[in-house]
């Protein structure tokens, strides 16, 4: 291979966030990688590109010009374009004087409908383009325009940061379009790879794409040269410094092909998070994001302090739990607030433990930092009334709790480490403290009975005054989870790959010997969807969490009692 780093030359690195995910805040991964590379390698010129936001910008412009014709509800194409434009305008500017929930729900539902239809269409077009089928000329131009800013920059290495599975096909298309125009190296990384049990399979197995017309296999290696399935900072830095093929063996977390074989380098973690500077969002146009306020993502720890949930694979992402020091957190938060003029933060930590949450909240108060923030936490009794009031005083406005089920037996089988009675009290106390609660609920965990399903429904009814947003879903069997590795412990008698399973998105069907089967659970779930969508201020807040934070901040009131 042609080595990346020419002695004496400055390497140009593009870090790209591909479509498509919610366009409500800038991507954290590219911002952190950009900051780390700028600090640690003066010989690397780094630029981050949010092609996801550009994708939405271009889509909305093309829709308004009639280049893309979409029909929502019973509207014609012109009316649809007008209504979607009105929705975006409202979501960005229409809540500044008053956050009218009824109007918000109306407009955000229009925007969600647009997202669902447009993204499904473009995903199909991306697959067609990849496997060589014809696509409308307007679509071809749209895709090529997306990568033009990256090509104009002229990088030697392109890093694609994938957070969600919805980005995977687009990431491969971006890589293909870039390599068509210029012979450059492409590395794929991000949290999506981190939760994969066997990311090296992306090189070993063909990528199968199916459209309405045909199914075709592609070789991943013709578009992507390297994978970084673990932490990317040190790996990307070393990759940029590689001067020959031999140097690749010294790049931690790297997966690549050599002599027609897949090579996997040992994993590496940065134990001292103080070595990683705060995220750099300077390459992103923050005013373009679609929401009432600019909300910046922030990470104060890596890994999960619990790490025992039987359904989860997030323990693959960061390997072990580490925390950024409180003083360093404050320094980075101050910088974000002062440099970007932003007062809204979304903590992306897997969850913040009670003791750390107390220390962080008290430190924010002591330093007089005025922010509004959302964070993930576990509903345990340590979150008592005094602590929840402290969190509210520090600027906490939304806490996202992993409740999952109201059945204690199911929670024990999940190894959640929570008690449902304690969780219920935490939600009530948080509401009285002035906080808004977003809770996560998972239906259909293996062995869950109809009575336990209904137990969770009753819990939601009983506590609806303290549940301000609900993020609901059906159980998905994830490769690498304890359930998948030890199915006998969960009454699973058979696991097989689903027909629609792909190397980049493993999907499993399964059978159980007791409790609700997947089909029975789905029937129950759909039967109760209307009730579930009545929980909280708007059923859309579960998807648009940055909007929930803005709404919560607009309704600030002193804690009760």
Set out the residue ranges of the language-model regions:
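N-terminal [4Fe-4S]-dependent radical SAM core
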Residues: 4-11, 257-297
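Conserved Radical SAM active-site core
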Residues: 11, 54-62, 66-155, 180, ...
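Conserved, mostly hydrophobic/aromatic
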Residues: 37, 254, 304, 347, ...
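Conserved SAM/AdoMet-binding glycine-rich loop
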Residues: 13-20, 157, 187-188, 195, ...
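Canonical Radical SAM [4Fe-4S] cluster-binding loop centered on the CxxxCxxC motif
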Residues: 291-327
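Structural recognition of alpha->loop->beta junctions
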Residues: 201-236, 390-399, 455-477
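C-terminal accessory regions of radical SAM enzymes
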Residues: 14-16, 23-24, 32, 49, ...
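Glycine-rich beta-alpha loop elements in corrinoid/cobalamin-binding modules
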Residues: 9-12, 20-58, 115-266
């Amino acid at each position: 291979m042609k080595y990346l780093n020419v002695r004496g030359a400055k390497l140009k690195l593009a870090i790209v966030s591909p479509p498509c995910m919610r366009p409500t805040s800038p991507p954290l991964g590219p911002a952190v990688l950009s900051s780390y590379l700028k600090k640690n390698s003066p010989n690397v010129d780094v630029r981050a590109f949010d092609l996801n936001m550009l994708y939405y910008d271009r889509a909305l412009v093309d829709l308004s010009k009639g280049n893309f014709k979409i029909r929502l509800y019973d509207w014609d194409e012109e009316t649809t374009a007008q209504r979607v434009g009105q929705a975006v305008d409202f979501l960005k500017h229409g809540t500044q004087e008053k956050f009218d929930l009824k109007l918000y729900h109306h407009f955000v539902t229009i925007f969600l409908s647009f997202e669902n239809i447009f993204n499904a269409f473009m995903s199909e077009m991306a697959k067609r383009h990849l496997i060589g089928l014809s696509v409308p000329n307007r679509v071809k131009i749209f895709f090529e325009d997306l990568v033009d800013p990256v090509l104009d920059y002229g990088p030697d290495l392109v890093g694609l940061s994938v957070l969600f599975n919805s980005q995977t096909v687009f990431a491969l298309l971006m890589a293909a379009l870039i390599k068509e125009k210029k012979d450059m190296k492409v590395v794929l990384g991000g949290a999506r790879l981190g939760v994969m049990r066997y990311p090296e399979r992306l090189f070993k197995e063909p990528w199968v794409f199916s459209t309405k017309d045909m199914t075709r296999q592609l070789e991943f290696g013709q578009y992507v040269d390297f994978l970084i399935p673990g932490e990317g900072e040190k790996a990307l830095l070393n990759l940029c410094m590689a001067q020959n093929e031999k140097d690749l063996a010294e790049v931690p977390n790297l997966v690549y092909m050599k002599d027609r074989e897949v090579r996997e380098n040992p994993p590496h973690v940065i134990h001292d998070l103080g070595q990683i500077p705060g995220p750099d969002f300077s390459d992103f146009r923050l005013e373009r994001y679609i929401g009432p306020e600019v909300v910046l993502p922030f990470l104060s720890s890596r890994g999960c302090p619990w790490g025992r949930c039987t359904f989860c694979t997030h323990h693959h992402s960061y390997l072990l739990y580490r925390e950024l020091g409180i003083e360093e957190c404050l320094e980075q938060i101050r910088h974000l607030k002062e440099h970007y003029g932003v007062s809204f933060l979304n903590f992306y930590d897997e969850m913040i433990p009670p003791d750390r949450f107390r220390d962080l909240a008290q430190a924010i108060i002591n330093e007089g930092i005025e922010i509004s923030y959302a964070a993930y936490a576990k509903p345990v009794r340590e979150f008592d009334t005094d602590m929840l009031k402290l969190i509210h005083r520090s600027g906490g406005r939304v806490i996202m709790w992993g409740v999952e089920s109201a059945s204690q037996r199911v929670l024990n089988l999940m190894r959640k480490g929570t008690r449902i009675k304690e969780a219920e009290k935490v939600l009530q106390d948080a509401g009285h403290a002035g906080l808004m609660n977003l809770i996560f609920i998972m239906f259909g965990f293996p062995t869950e009975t109809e009575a336990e399903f209904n137990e969770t429904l009753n819990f939601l009814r009983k506590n609806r005054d303290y549940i301000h947003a609900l993020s609901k879903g059906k159980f998905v069997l994830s490769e690498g989870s304890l359930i998948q590795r030890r199915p006998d412990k969960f009454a699973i008698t058979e696991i097989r790959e689903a027909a629609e399973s792909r190397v980049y998105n493993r999907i499993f069907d399964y059978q159980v010997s007791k409790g609700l089967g997947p089909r029975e659970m789905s029937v129950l779930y759909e039967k109760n969807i209307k009730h579930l969508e009545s929980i909280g201020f708007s059923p859309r807040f579960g998807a648009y969490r940055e909007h929930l934070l803005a709404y919560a901040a607009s309704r600030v009131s002193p804690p009760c009692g």
